[in-house]
Regions:
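Conserved phosphate/anionic-ligand binding catalytic regions in large, soluble enzymes, centered on
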Residues: 22-50, 93-117
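Conserved small/polar residues in nucleotide/adenosyl-binding loops
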Residues: 160-167
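Extended, charge-enriched "interface" segments that sit outside catalytic cores
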Residues: 153, 157-158
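Glycine-rich loop at the start of a catalytic domain that most often binds anionic cofactors/ligands
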Residues: 51-62
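Extended active-site and interfacial segments that coordinate phosphate-rich ligands
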Residues: 24-30, 109-143
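Glycine-rich, N-terminal phosphate-binding loop and its surrounding beta-alpha-beta segment
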Residues: 60-102
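Charged, compositionally biased N-terminal leader segments and the immediate start
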Residues: 2-19
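Structural signal for hydrophobic packing residues in well-ordered secondary-structure cores
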Residues: 34-37, 69-84, 114, 141-148, ...
Length: 167
């Protein structure tokens, strides 16, 4: 089985800076920071080889990728005592694209993945700050729409009036 997912943080580290070609710059640097015991939130990197495999396999992801991502996500959930999609203690993650070489400003990021109409209420309760929770959700929708769905980010600015639907 090919290893597609490399974990870092929370006492586990599958990589280091020497794996830049495999993990991309961000992934290799996160692995290296975890390796030298710097405080790095737990996470994982999907290797650059997944992109190659995807295109070599008629735009299908490797069959064993999902199981590896699920296992890595479960490890994070256990480490931070939150669960992806949980209404009371939602786990929020960031998805950051990366490459073997640095390309400042060219790679996309989606923050607060895990927020939805239900989990935003759990975030508001857990944080004690409803405005923060709704603003985080708004920013997630804007980033996801722009990065993943290719919706012009200016369209979101026209709709935005307040981070809380009650304001």
């Amino acid at each position: 089985m090919t290893k597609w997912v490399y974990n870092f943080g929370a006492g586990v580290n599958d990589g280091n800076a020497s794996l830049r070609n495999l993990l991309g710059g961000k992934g290799a640097n996160l692995a290296e920071m975890a390796a030298i015991d710097l405080p790095v939130p737990p996470g994982f990197t999907i290797t650059t080889e997944v992109c190659t495999a995807y295109y070599e396999n008629d735009r299908n992801y490797p069959a064993d990728l999902k199981a590896q991502v699920d296992a890595a996500l479960a490890r994070i959930e256990q480490a931070v005592e939150r669960k992806f999609g949980d209404k009371d203690k939602p786990l929020l993650v960031s998805v950051r694209s990366g490459a073997r070489v640095s390309m400042p400003g060219m790679m996309d990021t989606v923050l607060n993945l895990g927020l939805n109409d239900d989990t935003v209420l759990g975030l508001a309760k857990a944080s004690g700050d409803e405005r923060f929770a709704w603003d985080s959700y708004r920013r997630f929708i804007q980033m996801y729409g722009s990065v993943v769905l290719n919706v012009d980010h200016h369209r979101f600015c026209l709709l935005y009036t307040s981070p809380s639907p009650r304001d």
